[in-house]
Amino acid sequence: MTKKDKGPKFANVTTKSGEVVKVFEDLNDFETFIKNETEDEEFDHVHCHLKYYPPFVLHESHEDPEKIKDSANSHSKKFVRHLHQHIEKHLLKDIKERIKLPDLKFKDKAKEESFEHIVWKYNDVTQYHGKDFEIHITVECHNDSAIVDVDYLTKPLTAAVEA
């Protein structure tokens, strides 16, 4: 038996604009990557994407994605309620811990709903190791699947040039 690679597993995807985005399929790998980037002082230039089944969905299906109910999607009030609780109480909290900013508040929040999907957006400006940066987290669920898309983006704040 061979040793497993301990690093987070991801795929590099190049966008139309030429940006390379790391795409994860496992929540733990995603959180480990964010933690490692913070420790490597790369926390203000990160863009990655996570596509995963939320833990409450996997729990209901006894950890078998094949047994996930078709009703687990953005049209189900129960699914949306549980997903929002998961985002607020677990996902955002875990991200704050991984980037070593437990007091981050995500004051700028928004929710967009359409027939096809529901999108929650969380934005804030913060500072770590003397560097100011913006953090943007977008969570999206769709009407045809229980898979949730999370887009995580951090970018440095550009100082305003005084005239």
UniProtKB/Swiss-Prot annotation:
The keyword Hydrolase does not apply. Keywords: Cell membrane, Membrane. Pfam families: RGI1. Gene3D superfamilies: Respiratory growth induced protein 1. It is a peripheral membrane protein. GO terms for biological process: energy reserve metabolic process. It is found in: Cell membrane. The keyword Isomerase does not apply. It comes from the Eukaryota. GO terms for cellular component: plasma membrane. Its main location: membrane. Involved in the control of energetic metabolism and significantly contribute to cell fitness, especially under respiratory growth conditions. Belongs to the RGI1 family. This is Respiratory growth induced protein 1.
